[in-house]
A protein has these predicted regions:
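Compositional signal for N-terminal targeting/processing segments
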Residues: 1-201
Length: 201
């Protein structure tokens, strides 16, 4: 499993900013000890079918794209988000759009993502107990509604109860923009990493 960071990755920029300004930071996605175990554990036929249905359903942002006259979600996101000169005003709009998508297309959220989001909320609650004045969350747009509207703690605990675990080891590996591209086979890749590097600068 690889977690590639490019210079323009929001997570990497957040880490660098935190280090430079002596601000506590932490990863809050589901740890690999659980994530890898969930991938290797035998799932029930129903869970397997659900995951397959999510994959077959495609990119939920395609719905927004088609409504706005774009051919696909990738080109819509590129134009409306990545090239926006003043990105701050788009966050609320994206949250509202994704909230509507998740309500209308509940099948697009996989069982594994529901577990991940329960863990994210657990980490947010832990940070809130430390009485930080402000907490900044860097995550994918699809997860925003699930982190904004927090369910009961016991509901999340039920989702996380009895998660399987495996031993893991981590290391730093040099990574190229070719590997970050979709064409490399990287599922969460982007179309043209070099282009985004140019935009960042």
């Amino acid at each position: 499993v690889f977690y590639p960071f490019a210079e323009f990755s929001p997570e990497w920029q957040a880490i660098r900013y935190a280090v430079q300004n002596r601000i506590p930071f932490r990863f809050f996605d589901l740890p690999l000890i659980y994530s890898l175990a969930l991938r290797t554990e035998k799932t029930s036929e129903q869970e397997t079918e659900t995951t397959a249905e999510v994959a077959e359903a495609g990119d939920p942002f395609d719905w927004l794209a088609h409504a706005a006259g774009f051919t696909d979600g990738e080109s819509w996101w590129e134009t409306m988000i990545e090239h926006r000169q003043e990105p701050a005003d788009i966050f609320q709009a994206v949250q509202e759009a994704v909230t509507a998508l998740r309500e209308e297309l509940p099948g697009h959220t996989s069982p594994r993502d529901l577990i991940r989001e329960a863990w994210m909320r657990k980490m947010i609650r832990a940070a809130q107990k430390e009485n930080f004045e402000r907490i900044v969350v860097v995550c994918g747009a699809w997860h925003v509604p699930a982190l904004d509207d927090m369910p009961k703690v016991k509901d999340d605990n039920e989702l996380l109860k009895g998660l399987p675990k495996v031993k893991v080891e981590c290391t730093w590996i040099p990574w190229t923009y070719d590997r970050l591209a979709f064409r490399s086979g990287y599922g969460a890749g982007i179309e043209s990493p070099g282009w985004y590097h140019y935009l960042w600068h």
